[in-house]
Amino acid sequence: MTTIKTTVILFFALVINMAAAPAFAIQLDLMPGTQTVAPADTASLDIVISGLGAGSAPSLSSYDLEITYDDALLTPTLVNIGDPGLGDQLDLFGLGSIVSVTPGVGLLSISELSLDLPSDLDLLQADNFILASLTFTTLGVGNAAVGFGNVILGDSFGLPLAADVNGATIAIRNPVNGVPEPMTWALLLPGLAWLRGRRFRV
């Protein structure tokens, strides 16, 4: 009987703790959500994560993202890893992380793996920050959608994290003064890059 009572007490204690635990709604956004630029101009987007723990778990130790875009209207030219104000939050002490940027047709794959300790990530990582900043060159006139394909996020121990995602739209418009559309550029994209730098020309 004592064993049964103990089991019941532990069960209800677990339920109460789960109910009291904070709920984290992790989100990935491409920001700004909308912008207007001219043909043969550049457009920049930030990949922003929010909803992580503030000085506690969950934190982010890895991500593997597919960024989809309209290759008839856009071509990626630059990827900057990390937050320009906070620094790379997966490389808290500047000791390096494992980064990959792989361009493809209408697809840009970006991944990073932190080498920091789980306890450091949980305690010191910001609860929202920029993962990477993307720069595109515009090729024509129209509305270019940029979004997320496959998304894999790992917490400080590498366990999966779920997140809601929101894409962006780049409106490409001719100047109102009627200047003829400039000739578009055709850029050759390099292959896989395993680098520790923080800037990637694609």
List PLM regions with ranges.
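Ser/Thr/Pro-rich, low-complexity mucin-like regions
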Residues: 133-163
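Cleaved targeting-peptide boundary
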Residues: 23-31
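Structured beta-strand segments within beta-sheet-rich domains
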Residues: 46-51, 57, 88-142
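Low-complexity, serine/threonine/proline/glycine-rich extracellular segments that form mucin-like
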Residues: 33, 38-93
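Terminal edge beta-strands and adjacent linker/stalk segments
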Residues: 159-173
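A short, hydrophobic C-terminal helix/tail in secreted or cell-surface proteins
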Residues: 180-198
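Bacterial N-terminal signal peptides that target proteins for export
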Residues: 1-9
